[in-house]
Amino acid sequence: MSYSIGIDYGTASGRVFLINTTNGQVVSKFVKPYTHGVIESELNGLKIPHTYALQNSNDYLEIMEEGISYIVRESKIDPDNIVGIGIDFTSSTIIFTDENLNPVHNLKQFKNNPHAYVKLWKHHGAYKEAEKLYQTAIENNNKWLGHYGYNVSSEWMIPKIMEVMNRAPEIMEKTAYIMEAGDWIVNKLTNKNVRSNCGLGFKAFWEEETGFHYDLFDKIDPKLSKVIQDKVSAPVVNIGEAVGKLDDKMAQKLGLSKETMVSPFIIDAHASLLGIGSEKDKEMTMVMGTSTCHLMLNEKQHQVPGISGSVKGAIIPELFAYEAGQSAVGDLFEYVAKQAPKSYVDEAENRNMTVFELMNEKIKHQMPGESGLIALDWHNGNRSVLSDSNLTGCIFGLTLQTKHEDIYRAYLEATAFGTKMIMQQYQDWHMEVEKVFACGGIPKKNAVMMDIYANVLNKKLIVMDSEYAPAIGAAILGAVSGGAHNSINDAVDAMKEPILYEINPEAEKVQRYETLFKAYKALHDIHGYKKANIMKDIQSLRVEG
């Protein structure tokens, strides 16, 4: 009997799972919020700009060390039977280190410098740099930009590197290596300096055939090319391969065998496809958490406007993986719950239920359009298909009779409409969608929301019985790297999560949502394309820290 470890680094917390490689059984699990959380408003008592989202990398090591110690102790499994470790991580979450892989934010002189810290995926401080990258690529007719949806996001690695070069050159001077945080964990485990094809391909303008696009970097700033070459470039390990064995000192520290193999890191949402068993084309998977990623696989590389990228072999060898997404989903619902009137909070408490459960109860019998509201779910910008992190949310149709649960439902529907925009974009560019999977904590807990999605998308929705699909997917890669299975496909077949339930669309609701979607699309196009300056002009009045 063999086992593998899957370590899942999310936005707010980390998870360590011990999985049976034969049947996918969860033997033990450890879940812990990051000690320092997400650093968004202030750093060590100092105010930082509202576009920033940072983290402390020491939290990641804490999760790994405490988590592995716990699952080995709690499961009583012989460490010699743990054959592999897989890592998934939010992305693009990047870290700056010295030559010994020590993060520069741990240096005393940079303790209060936000640019020394981990830049979380939803850090939008590099929006000016992203715009410069995009304009330069367009001016130079870089055709490969189509592999990234003809857009550049401030959430990606290269704009964030440019941000540090421009605003904190003293940090760059002390930095020996720049990498995805997922790569950093892998390198700490193995004492190597490698990069995953998944992270580089989706977030750093790297392609298997051509490598980095230095021609573009040179036109922006020759110094940028040198930074990429000296600090980012490293041997690349593909998903499905092994990086190597645990470093001896790390094995001793973690209480594991030094024969334990480590796989390259995979982006967290991408790991979910493996965890739920989506291995084919014509299947769209929604990985739903603080944000939502919409993932597909295809044998060909199509240039789909507005998506976040397409990379060969980033999930399944020989297939192109496609990613699109929405920047605020779970975060948006949490925002609405926090705005609930005191009477709702008190009622929920008296009835021993959450505010979410109370609001779901209040809206579950409403028909589409009953509230008269429609919203744009851009509270954290729009990732797909507009690729504009500077857009903001709106709600239309408010009256003096509007109730809080009506607003909540409007936001649920808005995220479903945003998903439909993405699904239609895939289909318009020769990628048919026959099945839609939903995984994550939100789908499992919120059947009302899933009913809305099934009817908005007019597709059968398959909800998976897993809040932790990324951790399962990471463990699958760990099992492959450790030799428990001969291929990713074999490991997926043995270890994937089961289906929880399926929802079929209802004709009357579908028809009503078609009418609402036309209104949503009109507002989307007005405020996203034609009059996008309205939101941005308002935001420009905010005082930057």
From Swiss-Prot:
Record keyword Ribosomal protein present: no
Cellular component GO terms, alphabetical: cytoplasm
GO molecular function: ATP binding; D-ribulokinase activity; ribulokinase activity
Catalytic reaction(s) noted: D-ribulose + ATP = D-ribulose 5-phosphate + ADP + H(+); L-ribulose + ATP = L-ribulose 5-phosphate + ADP + H(+)
Family statement: Belongs to the ribulokinase family.
HAMAP family in the record: Ribulokinase
This protein's name: Ribulokinase
Species annotation: Staphylococcus aureus (strain NCTC 8325 / PS 47)
